[in-house]
From Swiss-Prot:
May be involved in electron transfer from bc1 complex to aa3. Gene3D superfamilies: Cytochrome c-like domain. Binds 1 heme c group covalently per subunit. Belongs to the cytochrome c family. It is a single-pass type II membrane protein. Residues 1-8 are cytoplasmic. The keyword Iron applies. GO terms for cellular component: plasma membrane. Heme c binds at residues 82, 85-86, 148. Residues 30-173 are periplasmic. The gene is cycM. It is found in: Cell membrane. The keyword Secreted does not apply. This is Cytochrome c homolog.
Length: 173
């Protein structure tokens, strides 16, 4: 290969590169891309829900009356969702939550081999009907900062049924 032929090949490569660059510059001039969007993503209209009390005052819940009409069999059905995280066996293992054997009347945060959240450990007192009712209704309101991620049981009669069911798992049995 002679020097002339080599020069022609190099010139052809340089000319092709120059043409490619010119096409790129012209394309950028003709088609200006939008680099920064005005808003990122999509806006979704969401209705705000406030936790403020409604204008209608709710009647206080009479827990002793609910306990009189409580049904342990119904409580057993409702409590099945508890068994994913809790055990009902006497001296049963702790799962995600502590075992619930003899929970009614027991001091709060009293299972020694379970690590309770500081929120629940600080409460003190025993698990009576009122405290169990409040905790089962909405654990995060009763003990803000609790590890229990359960949303709660909304129907008061269902809560009373679960409490009566839990009372069947006591030290006398």
């Amino acid at each position: 290969m002679s020097g002339k032929e080599l020069n022609k090949i190099v010139a052809a490569i340089l000319f092709a590169s120059l043409i490619a660059m010119m096409v790129g510059f012209i394309a950028n001039i003709l088609y200006k891309p939008v680099l920064e969007p005005k808003h990122r993503g999509y806006s979704i209209a969401v209705q705000e829900v406030s936790e403020a009390p409604t204008t209608q005052a709710q009647a206080p819940i009479n827990i002793p009356e609910l306990m009189k009409t409580a049904n342990a069999d119904n409580g057993r059905e409702i409590a099945k969702k508890c068994l994913m995280c809790h055990s009902l066996d006497k001296d049963g293992p702790n799962k995600i939550g502590p075992h619930l054997w003899d929970v009614a009347g027991r001091p709060k945060a009293s299972i020694t081999d379970y690590k309770y959240s500081p929120a629940l450990s600080a409460l003190g007192g025993n698990w009576d009907d009122d405290s169990l009712f409040a905790f089962l209704h909405k654990p995060s309101s009763y003990a803000p900062g609790t590890k229990m991620s359960f949303a709660g049981i909304s129907k008061p009669q269902d809560i009373a049924d679960v409490i009566l069911f839990l009372k069947t798992y006591v030290h006398d049995k």
